[in-house]
Amino acid sequence: MSSGPASGLTGMESERVVVSKTIEATPEAVFAVLADPSAHADIDGTGWVRESLDGSRIIAAGQVFRMAMRHPNHPDNDYKVANRVEVFDEPRAIAWQPGTELPETGELSFGGWIWRYDLEATGPSRTTVTLTYDWSAVPAPVREHIQFPPFGLDHLDNSLQHLSDLVT
């Protein structure tokens, strides 16, 4: 069970969107779900995130985990992303930066946007989760092809509700 709606604290000028939601679960329980890429499709809820390709949990900053994706505006419809973990501070914060991996060389490149979850215990079994989508480091050439944010602002609120449903 969760309490209160997620509140969209948006700042489009600052090139990031921030939402928060209080979830009736410990930070450890919430973090465990976020560190499991096999749960990310359920957290997303749009059908864009399809499945984990590695089958392993996130355990450290610098780790790369791969996901199968689908988006109608992507040239291939189905594609893969390689996410590099930027922050791993169990059970307080986790963040990753999506990118691509060249199949021929395995070389990774990243687009400059980051998904970050900050968790704060607000009671014995209550956590305030703050989700930040930050695209401030996206270079101009990428911005010519992708509009930011590439989803409606309700997407982040919905993601936190899905996370709450999975944890509780």
Regions found by a protein language model. Name each.
Residues 2-56:
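Hydrophobic ligand-binding cavity/cleft-lining segments
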Residues 6-8, 70-73, 103-107, 117:
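Short, P/G- and charge-enriched loop/turn segments at secondary-structure junctions
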Residues 11-13, 59, 75-79, 107-111, ...:
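A generic structural micro-feature
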Residues 19-21, 80-87, 112-121:
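Hydrophobic/aromatic beta-strand elements that line small-molecule binding cavities or substrate pockets
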Residues 24-28, 58-59, 86-93, 118-128, ...:
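A short, structured loop/turn motif at beta-sheet edges
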Residues 30-34, 40, 65-67, 85, ...:
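Hydrophobic pocket/interface hotspot
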Residues 52-104, 165-166:
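Glycine-rich portal/gate segments that line the openings of hydrophobic small-molecule binding cavities
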Residues 97-154, 158:
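Beta-strand/loop substructures that line and gate deep hydrophobic ligand-binding cavities in soluble
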